[in-house]
């Protein structure tokens, strides 16, 4: 999951949908290799100014790192839970499918950007459907960012009491000042709000790179703890306490399920989709790429998605093989409070998510200002009020939601399929001219099927999730 840019760059004068001259169509075909055609004005002999006439400075390797960091987010903590409810083989197959589909959707975005020279996700919405399209895309991105903020604050809610309790040698369940709900309010007021009130991100924007480093540390620790805890969990002191996860609930034979389907599967695929959302960041990274071509940026995307697939697969597999069917949606909760290695992991993750929340809040506020107050000058009162209202709403959400799985599941069933499946396919169908790709050509049929798949995925996931909530199975699952 990544930090989504909810504010677009200034776009060029839009061309009419579905129409291109013969020369422009030829330019589009050349654009399979170059980002924008380099035609010249016959009157002046000068090349027309395009937004990418400046040379990008970011290397290929750094672009891979940036996009990998955009993909990486809190969703990695829920992947072992997803594997527990699908089985090892089925999970890895689903994860591979989500990765491949994410790569294809990025291909659709890059192709659309190549046609019209736009470098922001919501500007593609305006190009395809006018101002209403831009508003819809901005709302979806804001929803996804609110979900990301909620997941980060939920991690603070569950992990900070354990960290403070360890240092103070206190029971986080027994002392009122170690309650998670109180702590997230204090962290929001004392740390997140002051950072969110800054007028510009400045160096705070670089703190998002902490997430990738912290999650690598998390992965290494999960692998190490698997071999330390071993199989005989009933005699191991490093697992969670009995009241957190009853020992009899562990798989006594330590046999992993290779393929399984249960009522909680309605959460598993959305968790995987949530973990791969990076699409609003693709076009800005494309803009900054040195020698930007569609093929080169697609290679950046493929390498980033491939690296995250490996990292996600390892984390889920070793986490599941440590705790089997008892693993929780937030895997760090499974480890004991006194484990010093896990304490270091908790501190690293807490630092990363705390500093990332204001970074996520910035584009939401900017998008709201552009949508609600497009012609208004900067106002500190409005700047502070939007940040405060957003933090209050997210805190209420985190306090009321019982598990982080519900956040992963809902966002992974709504904004994630919209950003990965539905919007890229709709953009492709609307933006790519019929002179280049006829309506019934194979690429457009593929894009149409891709969008339909996203709609079905959203409908089925939400249907099963609401059914679980209505019947109480969500609470009875024990996680």
From Swiss-Prot:
<feature type="site" description="Involved in pH-sensing to the transport activity regulation">
    <location>
        <position position="471"/>
    </location>
</feature>
<feature type="topological domain" description="Cytoplasmic">
    <location>
        <begin position="286"/>
        <end position="302"/>
    </location>
</feature>
<dbReference type="GO" id="GO:0015804">
    <property type="term" value="P:neutral amino acid transport"/>
</dbReference>
<feature type="topological domain" description="Cytoplasmic">
    <location>
        <begin position="198"/>
        <end position="202"/>
    </location>
</feature>
<dbReference type="GO" id="GO:1904557">
    <property type="term" value="P:L-alanine transmembrane transport"/>
</dbReference>
<dbReference type="GO" id="GO:1903713">
    <property type="term" value="P:asparagine transmembrane transport"/>
</dbReference>
<keyword id="KW-0472">Membrane</keyword>
<dbReference type="GO" id="GO:0140830">
    <property type="term" value="F:L-glutamine, sodium:proton antiporter activity"/>
</dbReference>
<comment type="similarity">
    <text>Belongs to the amino acid/polyamine transporter 2 family.</text>
</comment>
<feature type="topological domain" description="Cytoplasmic">
    <location>
        <begin position="119"/>
        <end position="135"/>
    </location>
</feature>
<feature type="topological domain" description="Extracellular">
    <location>
        <begin position="324"/>
        <end position="341"/>
    </location>
</feature>
<keyword id="KW-1015">Disulfide bond</keyword>
<feature type="transmembrane region" description="Helical">
    <location>
        <begin position="447"/>
        <end position="467"/>
    </location>
</feature>
<dbReference type="GO" id="GO:0022858">
    <property type="term" value="F:alanine transmembrane transporter activity"/>
</dbReference>
<dbReference type="GO" id="GO:0015194">
    <property type="term" value="F:L-serine transmembrane transporter activity"/>
</dbReference>
<feature type="topological domain" description="Extracellular">
    <location>
        <begin position="405"/>
        <end position="406"/>
    </location>
</feature>
<dbReference type="GO" id="GO:0005886">
    <property type="term" value="C:plasma membrane"/>
</dbReference>
<feature type="topological domain" description="Extracellular">
    <location>
        <begin position="157"/>
        <end position="176"/>
    </location>
</feature>
<feature type="transmembrane region" description="Helical">
    <location>
        <begin position="407"/>
        <end position="427"/>
    </location>
</feature>
<dbReference type="GO" id="GO:0140893">
    <property type="term" value="F:neutral amino acid, sodium:proton antiporter activity"/>
</dbReference>
<feature type="transmembrane region" description="Helical">
    <location>
        <begin position="303"/>
        <end position="323"/>
    </location>
</feature>
<dbReference type="Pfam" id="PF01490">
    <property type="entry name" value="Aa_trans"/>
</dbReference>
<dbReference type="GO" id="GO:0032973">
    <property type="term" value="P:amino acid export across plasma membrane"/>
</dbReference>
<feature type="topological domain" description="Extracellular">
    <location>
        <begin position="468"/>
        <end position="479"/>
    </location>
</feature>
<dbReference type="GO" id="GO:0005290">
    <property type="term" value="F:L-histidine transmembrane transporter activity"/>
</dbReference>
<protein>
    <recommendedName>
        <fullName>Sodium-coupled neutral amino acid transporter 5</fullName>
    </recommendedName>
</protein>
<feature type="transmembrane region" description="Helical">
    <location>
        <begin position="62"/>
        <end position="84"/>
    </location>
</feature>
<keyword id="KW-0812">Transmembrane</keyword>
<feature type="transmembrane region" description="Helical">
    <location>
        <begin position="98"/>
        <end position="118"/>
    </location>
</feature>
<comment type="function">
    <text>Symporter that cotransports neutral amino acids and sodium ions, coupled to an H(+) antiporter activity. Releases L-glutamine and glycine from astroglial cells and may participate in the glutamate/GABA-L-glutamine cycle and the NMDA receptors activation. In addition, contributes significantly to L-glutamine uptake in retina, namely in ganglion and Mueller cells therefore, participates in the retinal glutamate-glutamine cycle. The transport activity is pH sensitive, Li(+) tolerant, bidirectional and associated with large uncoupled fluxes of protons.</text>
</comment>
<feature type="transmembrane region" description="Helical">
    <location>
        <begin position="177"/>
        <end position="197"/>
    </location>
</feature>
<feature type="disulfide bond">
    <location>
        <begin position="231"/>
        <end position="254"/>
    </location>
</feature>
<feature type="glycosylation site" description="N-linked (GlcNAc...) asparagine">
    <location>
        <position position="236"/>
    </location>
</feature>
<feature type="topological domain" description="Extracellular">
    <location>
        <begin position="85"/>
        <end position="97"/>
    </location>
</feature>
<feature type="transmembrane region" description="Helical">
    <location>
        <begin position="203"/>
        <end position="223"/>
    </location>
</feature>
<feature type="topological domain" description="Cytoplasmic">
    <location>
        <begin position="363"/>
        <end position="383"/>
    </location>
</feature>
<keyword id="KW-1133">Transmembrane helix</keyword>
<feature type="transmembrane region" description="Helical">
    <location>
        <begin position="384"/>
        <end position="404"/>
    </location>
</feature>
<feature type="transmembrane region" description="Helical">
    <location>
        <begin position="342"/>
        <end position="362"/>
    </location>
</feature>
<feature type="topological domain" description="Extracellular">
    <location>
        <begin position="224"/>
        <end position="264"/>
    </location>
</feature>
<dbReference type="GO" id="GO:1903803">
    <property type="term" value="P:L-glutamine import across plasma membrane"/>
</dbReference>
<dbReference type="GO" id="GO:0015187">
    <property type="term" value="F:glycine transmembrane transporter activity"/>
</dbReference>
